[in-house]
């Protein structure tokens, strides 16, 4: 029985193809019960690697059935056929994903970015409060509804945090996500605190929102990692970003995990509060080199050498950020990263997975 027939029997009239990944495909469909269009992700167990089926897929389905938040894509129904095809019926992001939106519209005004980022941060806090981590936060996984509200999607690498006998979160050893959004500790294959990893990815996302470009050039991972570990963040001068916005990004892109912000600190940050009548001017910054700044506004920053890379790393016509999944026993990333280049559709859940533990 083909997909259209299976779905028709369940009350869904199949529409267009939305995307296809290594182990999943996504179609639009009209729900006769809900009376509106939905997205249907279809995964065939027989065509999917064992590690994905046994580890990542059950986690994703468990978490999709658990989460319920206004800024997270809704899951309406999950069912499976006798021949091993899984159908996940989800809310449809009718305006596409955030990356395509920014590539079309350019950098967002801070007021627009503030609204969207507050929605995203609220969704992440909801997950973290449930001890759920996403581990693949990126613009492609942020869908937009008809009113351009953020909807977090793709929980393919998500997991529930494990805790030891003292209640402390056990470090993760599955080094997953996309290289351009991955924290330094993940790039180095250092066991990491998964909630803190999500925060770094949030920093990259906010930078893209307000700058319209990537904060780091991931075409050279070694060089990118060196720049990140020096806590160097360049902001395009032409964007005239406020002091508070730069400060929030800088604190999220903190290579020292003990100093990186937590989600509650992000939500309480001054930049995410309702704007004051008179916004803080960014004119008090003293810049050096290619947009790197020295703070005169009580920012937690430090001066450094002139950057040897240029800011304003363009967003490509197609997103091909390397997907990382490194086995538990791998050592350092630089020589052993299992890098797979692909254009990942914003609806398609995690693919190309390797052996992993937590």
Swiss-Prot record:
Subcellular location: Cytoplasm; Cytoplasm, Cytoskeleton, Microtubule organizing center, Centrosome, Centriole
Start and end residues of each stretch annotated as Disordered: 302-358
Enzyme active site: 136
Catalyzed reaction equations: L-seryl-[protein] + ATP = O-phospho-L-seryl-[protein] + ADP + H(+); L-threonyl-[protein] + ATP = O-phospho-L-threonyl-[protein] + ADP + H(+)
Activity regulation details: Activated by phosphorylation on Thr-174, potentially by autophosphorylation.
GO MF terms, alphabetically ordered: ATP binding; magnesium ion binding; protein serine kinase activity; protein serine/threonine kinase activity; protein-containing complex binding
Distribution of this protein across tissues and organs: Testis-specific. Present in mature spermatozoa (at protein level).
Binding positions for ATP per the UniProt entry: 18-26, 41
EC number, as in UniProt: 2.7.11.1
This protein's UniProt keywords: ATP-binding, Cytoplasm, Cytoskeleton, Developmental protein, Differentiation, Kinase, Magnesium, Metal-binding, Nucleotide-binding, Phosphoprotein, Serine/threonine-protein kinase, Spermatogenesis, Transferase, Ubl conjugation
GO cellular component: acrosomal vesicle; centriole; cytoplasm; nucleus
Keyword GTP-binding on entry: no
Residue stretches making up the Protein kinase domain: 12-272
PROSITE patterns reported in the protein's UniProt record: PROTEIN_KINASE_ATP, PROTEIN_KINASE_DOM, PROTEIN_KINASE_ST
GO biological process: protein autophosphorylation; protein phosphorylation; spermatid development
Basic and acidic residues: bias regions: 302-315, 329-349
Stated family: Belongs to the protein kinase superfamily. CAMK Ser/Thr protein kinase family.
Subunit structure: Interacts with TSSK1B. Interacts with HSP90; this interaction stabilizes TSSK2.
Additional comment: TSSK1B might be used as a target for male contraception or and intra-vaginal spermicides.
Protein name: Testis-specific serine/threonine-protein kinase 2
Originating organism: Homo sapiens (Human)
